[in-house]
């Protein structure tokens, strides 16, 4: 058989030479010796005579093979690179630390290591850039991940002593000081660039790297230089080069350019990051470890790609997610959405090139928010919260269709913020008068409307930009809620068509409907969000995902959490994309907790993600829910511990290891939770991200060093026992 593209094999046979009915099996052969190593463990496949005429072709596609070896199960660890800590790291995890993590994984019989996105997010040079999903390049890695120890010895001994003192100071901190770390490592890189840069850039290895990566490396270096030169990443505000022109940027980056020294510094840094991650990826392969990367669903609107390929993006909207367990107001990520119609014209080359680049380093990847390939939650640029969004693409409703459900359509009442005296008093109490004077104006009777100067959430946000006290935040959130208090949102392309506003049943305007109107609205709402789009979104996903998943041989895993349409598992099953299974976020809405023994084989099982509290953190969040879990899932009775002891965590971890999922990848914090002697005393400090807070500081760092972890015989032997006895090695 011939592999015509990653994971797709074909064979052509002359039907006149065959005897029917034909029985056959697939075999796995050694790539070198060509000897058969394994037969399918399955009934014979049968093919009856297709009775072809001369010149006719009969296709018989097979979607799955059944090798015993392919049914293995694997355990692994998920941790951001920035969270790693070694004795030699510089206040943040780096690509050199990855090899130590891989050593620990192999020592404990784990066979997978998963990390968060590692792309450059440098926008403001402040801690606000710590958010790893807001990258300025889909190719360039963040400079803070460079292992300075691999750059060679610094000749300036005085400077080296100063840097070493700073390294020890930053490495001793319990969390990452993002700004201090990046400033110090950048200064170190500048010194080493002056010392070795010319030699590195003249090497054959660098020239090969540059030739293969020039298409992104050159514009990235130019973007980074211009960002700092003009003091903003917003290229629309630059006095020059607001519109990307390849010939102008080539001249800017030419060796005879006055700024070439600074441009070349970015080349030097990206080259070292490339060879270090490539080394870590190859090391994982040698150790038999699946190295799993993460593909963010979005890019920064102030990014290299938005600058050089604006036609691929819709810059007038914001990507996000509807309300879910993470955020009652939805999530607004701020990313531009994709112009899929344009991407389709070149067979999604933008994505294919991106995945092929990832495949140089990784053997598996996670598609962040895979739902975005079916439809994306697009929020107007004037909104802060996600409640006024709409799915794109979608099938909006006409007025006639809305009324066909028995709901009389009243445009002003249903599409403009409903505000009355009762609402203002309930929401703002003794501050209602201030809100009336400042943000709303009287319309008629007891009805108010937003003042034009504050009729969007962005305008309100600007008013409160310098007001950080608790009372101001309460008023700001209340005014946001006034603006989103509508029943329907006009379609972005066809404003005479409408989408029911997400999660409006808990808002004041819904309470103004009578019981018949509420019933009619709920019927159209449920049909719209849970039935109407299934076939439509299935077709949308099948335009993109088959091409993208077959662009490389990497194992594809989808993050399918949130508001998941029925068509998502159809596509993921068909394309054999691994789902994500989390017990506290069950796929079956009738269950409070997922049944781990029912997880599909093609899935990734975990206890918590970076967007959630850890196992120990979750245990302490809701005591009544914890009691139900302790009694009904774990099968224990008696007094429920307020904090999760090690034995409870171990039992939960073991249950997850025993599940049918191909991959059981647990967060580093959840692995450590089973051992009360080494786990971090401060439960809350272990949390990586709080999605409801768009200004969260991503700074979690493991409290042990990797060297200490590798030497901890008792803990490591416990992991080996758990992994081996549950059939994951």
For the regions a protein language model found, what residue spans apply to each?
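Aromatic-rich carbohydrate-binding modules that target alpha-glucans
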Residues: 1-20, 27-52, 90
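Catalytic cores of glycan-processing enzymes that make or break glycosidic bonds
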Residues: 12-17, 44-729
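Intrinsically disordered, low-complexity N-terminal regions enriched in serine/proline/glycine
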Residues: 23-25, 208
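Short, conserved beta-strand segments within well-ordered enzyme catalytic domains
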Residues: 25-27, 114
């Amino acid at each position: 058989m011939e592999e015509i593209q990653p994971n797709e094999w074909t064979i052509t046979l002359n039907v006149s030479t065959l005897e029917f009915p034909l029985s056959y099996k697939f075999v796995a052969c050694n790539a070198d010796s060509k000897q058969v190593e394994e037969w399918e463990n399955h009934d014979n496949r049968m093919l009856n005579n297709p009775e072809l005429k001369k010149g006719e072709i009969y296709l018989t596609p097979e979607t799955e093979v059944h090798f015993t070896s392919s049914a293995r199960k694997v355990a692994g660890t998920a941790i951001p690179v920035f969270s790693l800590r070694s004795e030699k790291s510089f206040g943040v995890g780096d690509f050199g630390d990855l090899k130590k993590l891989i050593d620990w994984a192999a020592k404990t019989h784990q066979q997978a290591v998963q990390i968060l996105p590692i792309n450059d997010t440098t926008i403001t040079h402040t801690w606000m850039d710590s958010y790893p999903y807001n990258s300025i390049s889909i190719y360039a890695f963040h400079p803070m991940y460079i292992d300075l120890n691999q750059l060679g010895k610094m000749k300036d001994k005085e400077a080296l002593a100063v840097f070493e003192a700073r390294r020890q100071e930053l490495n001793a901190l319990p969390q990452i000081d993002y700004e201090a770390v990046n400033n110090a490592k950048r200064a170190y890189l500048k010194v080493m660039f002056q010392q070795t840069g010319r030699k590195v850039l003249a090497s054959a290895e660098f020239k090969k790297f540059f030739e293969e990566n020039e298409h992104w490396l050159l514009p990235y270096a130019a973007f980074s230089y211009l960002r700092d030169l003009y003091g903003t990443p917003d290229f629309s505000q630059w006095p020059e080069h607001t519109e990307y022109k390849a010939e102008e940027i080539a001249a800017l980056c030419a060796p005879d350019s006055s700024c070439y020294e600074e441009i070349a510094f970015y080349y030097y840094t990206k080259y070292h990051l490339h060879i270090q991650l490539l080394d870590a990826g190859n090391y994982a392969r040698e150790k038999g470890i699946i190295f799993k990367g993460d593909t963010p669903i979005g890019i920064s609107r102030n990014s290299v790609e938005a600058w050089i390929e604006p036609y691929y993006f819709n810059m007038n909207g914001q990507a996000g997610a509807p309300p879910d367990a993470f955020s009652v107001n939805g999530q607004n990520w701020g990313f531009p959405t994709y112009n899929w119609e344009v991407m389709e014209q070149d067979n999604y080359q933008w994505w294919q090139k991106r995945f092929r680049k990832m495949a140089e380093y990784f053997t598996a990847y996670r598609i962040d928010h895979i739902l975005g390939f079916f439809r994306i939650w697009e929020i107007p640029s004037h909104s802060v919260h996600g409640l006024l969004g709409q799915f794109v693409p979608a099938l909006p409703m006409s007025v006639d269709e809305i009324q066909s459900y028995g709901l009389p359509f009243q445009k002003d009442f249903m599409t403009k913020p409903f505000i009355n005296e009762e609402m203002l008093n309930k929401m703002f109490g003794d501050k209602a008068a201030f809100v009336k004077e400042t943000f709303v104006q009287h319309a008629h009777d007891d009805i108010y409307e937003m003042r034009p100067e504050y009729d969007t959430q962005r305008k309100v946000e600007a008013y409160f930009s310098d007001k950080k006290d608790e009372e101001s935040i309460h008023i700001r959130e209340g005014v946001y809620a006034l603006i989103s208090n509508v029943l329907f949102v006009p379609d972005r392309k066809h404003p005479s068509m409408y989408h029911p506003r997400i999660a409006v049943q808990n808002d004041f305007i819904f309470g103004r409907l009578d019981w018949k109107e509420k019933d009619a609205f709920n019927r159209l709402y449920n049909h719209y969000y849970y039935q109407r789009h299934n076939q439509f979104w299935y077709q949308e996903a099948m335009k993109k995902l088959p091409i993208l998943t077959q662009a490389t041989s990497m194992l594809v895993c989808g993050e399918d959490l949130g508001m998941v349409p029925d068509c998502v598992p159809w596509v993921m099953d068909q394309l054999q994309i691994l789902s994500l299974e989390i017990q506290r976020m069950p796929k079956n809405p009738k269950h409070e907790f997922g049944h781990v023994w029912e997880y599909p084989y093609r899935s990734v099982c975990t206890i918590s993600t970076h967007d959630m509290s850890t196992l120990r953190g979750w245990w302490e969040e809701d005591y009544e829910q914890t009691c139900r879990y302790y009694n009904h899932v774990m099968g224990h009775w008696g007094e429920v511990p307020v904090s999760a002891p090690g034995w409870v965590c171990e039992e939960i971890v073991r249950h997850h290891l025993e599940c049918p999922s191909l991959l059981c990848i647990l967060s580093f914090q959840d692995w450590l939770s089973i051992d009360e002697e080494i786990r971090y005393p401060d439960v809350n400090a272990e949390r990586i991200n709080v999605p409801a807070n768009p200004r969260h500081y991503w700074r979690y760092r493991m409290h042990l060093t990797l060297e200490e972890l590798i030497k901890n015989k008792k803990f490591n032997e416990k992991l080996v026992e758990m992994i081996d006895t549950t059939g994951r090695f």
